[in-house]
Amino acid sequence: MTSKKPTPMMKQWHQCKEQAGESLLLFRMGDFYEAFYDDAVLLSQNLDINLTQRQGIPMSGIPVSTVNGYIDRLVSKGFKVAIAEQIEEAQNNKGKSEPLARELQRFVTPGTLLSSSLLPEKANNYIVSIYRVGSLFGFSCLDFSTGAFLLNEYDNMKDLIDEICRLAPTEILSCDKFYKKHFEIVEQIQQHLKLTLSTYSDWAFEHQFATQKLSSHFNVSSLDGFGLKGLVPAINAAGALLSYLQDKLLLPVEHISVPKTHGNQKHLLIDTASQVNLELLTPIHDPQGKSSLLHVMERTCTPMGGRLLRNTLVNPFYDQKEILLRQDAVEFLLNRSELRKNLRSFLSQVRDLERLTTKITTALAGPKDIGMLRDSLNASMHICEILSPLPLPEFFHGKFTLGLGLASLLELLSKALFGELPLRISDGNIFSDDHHPDLKRLRYTRENSKEWLWQYQDAIRTQTGVKKLKVCYSQVLGYYIEVSSDLAPLLPKDFIRRQSRLHAERFTTEKLQEFQDDMLNVSDKLQTLETQLFKDLCAQILEQRDAILSLSQVIADTDYILSLADLAAEYGYCRPIVDTSDSLSITGGMHPVAQTLLDRGTFIPNDIKMHSARTRMILITGPNMAGKSTYIRQIALLIIMAQMGSFIPARSAHIGMIDKIFTRIGAGDNLSKGMSTFMVEMAETANILHNATDRSLIVLDEVGRGTSTYDGLAIAQSVVEYLLFTEGKKAKTLFATHYKELTDLENHCPHVENFHAGVRENGGHPVFLYEILKGHSQKSFGIHVAKLAGFPLCVISRAQQILRQLEGPETTSKQTQEKVQQLTLF
């Protein structure tokens, strides 16, 4: 930095920069936000804008009118942005030697977006706070754009990481002490998520401070009433998060909801590996592609409905009543196609009620936002009017009276506002003329001043009988009425004399003075009036804030159910029986994603029938590409859909609720952690063995393949035996394997059944049937797969020769067998 004495304006900048810390500071100067020193260099490099100098100080700037787009670009690159505003109008600073007053007013970080193109419409944007006390990890997350505030505690790192990955935050907050001691947590999370790390003071995570912060914000003397008694680490994380937003980032927090415990006792748990392996939200090999379960199920019309669908997909229910309530509601709409069409029409007109309410609460809403709220309430009212008279299933009971209760607010907004509204209050033309008596007069004055003067002149000529009276204007007097001196006595007594001339007299009236005042300040008066009216209207809206948020949840629920009903109607899904039994029976089941990617009717359906008293484990053998992996994933996906309350692609199904789903399906090398593919495989399998229960579903694909044949086989068989015979671990297990030796377990254990992916040979070449059939496979057809993969023909020929030798009775070399089998078990 320069050694010259800073100017008064740069002193302001230094004060703001000290407060901004590591954030990139945008400093308002007239019509631009300027950056100085290192911030200017960063701004120039990352936004491709000019870097200049003033008095040796590097500087660059962006226009106020387009600042939001530039901020989005900075945040998308991982920057935190601090914004210093002018808090004094230029006209109020005339004659003063000091610069305009400025202060740091807000920060923008990835986890605190509100008005941004980066904010995902149908996904939450969470910031997460984590802390540890003793053996417990405290966890709190908040969606600043909706105000949703959740917290929980975990007794192990794995569950904490899984929950954070499930929520997919864009920013994580903790203190230096935690990061130094537990940075492996962040490293593991960063393998799955792109996020920003933020640090806050250690003292903010202390229990006394955190408790006081939360109690003060929610105006309570104790947090016990929120169900938080004894949750010390979670309270510490939540209090620090609230303080970080309010005290560090200077953000409004009035809209933040009462914190809720984010428990998993009534949800089907899906760990991070399974969420990825099953491609619930994002395809593994094509992140922008269409082969995720979310993409297939996504039929929602509203942002709130989309977020609810996404959240339920990774947190299905483990509560029979909740599942049945939604199934009944889906069936109700499924049988009423015209009703679905009408609902879809109105739902598509509903904007993001949650985020609109947040913008109004935080005083960041503009006229267009209020217009979107009005239109959304109008569409929601139609939805309530359509559904409330119908014989609705229990899920919908009592929901649609909420919308009708907002009729008076909708009427107010409809009468108060113009149809088309501007982005900014300063653009004007927000309120209709009838909303306030001064609006019509001021607008008329502004737009029809000359006509008004002619009409007024005619009116007072008629009133006084003085036909030669004139209305004139001068820089000194402003507007005045002039008559010849001999006619002045004819004017009414309420005419106010302004000036006497040699042969004329000049007057004014209260009405003309009012017109003059209006004309001289009409634009300012209009803006001031509409600004105040806008604030008043927002205050009236916020009186109904809770009702609007309740309506938002009703709309989300309706949209969610409609989405599932539309999906079921489009593909002819069946309603599964979901209960507390131990059954897993699906007839004619199809992979919900693969089914949509193939021509209709070409996907081969398959069955499954499991019950702990009979079959707890199915071993599936057969060649690669024959459908084993698709089948085992399919079963897991159908269970997830069923426990969301959705219908599923099958002819019939009876599913006893599953409490946890675990998958061990492939793995990429984790070189940054020094973990090989095999180590990842073993770590994931260990997690399954430790955490599975009798009511879990385990999907295993080729466990043990990453080491020597005998080591792998030994591990695989040991895993199988552990899951079959260990009390509390007797989960339903689907195990796809090339180890034919495992299939012998069927002869020794009544709870194991062998199945295989069907193949028919035609002229020595396999034809994959994509059917899962009883019994084990006789051949792997690995060389055929290598041929399909494009191996040179000489390599294929040599492999066939070696295979014939190995399959012959003369081959007894254990070493040769082990090496070659390892190669063919891909």
Curated annotation (Swiss-Prot):
- Kindly indicate whether the keyword Nucleotide-binding belongs to this entry: yes
CDD domains referenced in this protein's UniProt entry, alphabetically: ABC_MutS1
Pfam families this protein is in?
MutS_I, MutS_II, MutS_III, MutS_IV, MutS_V
A molecular function annotated in GO for this UniProt entry is: ATP-dependent DNA damage sensor activity
GO terms for biological process, alphabetical: mismatch repair
Family label: Belongs to the DNA mismatch repair MutS family.
Q: What is this protein called?
A: DNA mismatch repair protein MutS
Say which species the protein is native to.
Answer: Chlamydia caviae (strain ATCC VR-813 / DSM 19441 / 03DC25 / GPIC) (Chlamydophila caviae)
Q: What is the lineage of its organism?
A: Bacteria, Pseudomonadati, Chlamydiota, Chlamydiia, Chlamydiales
**Gene that this sequence comes from:** mutS
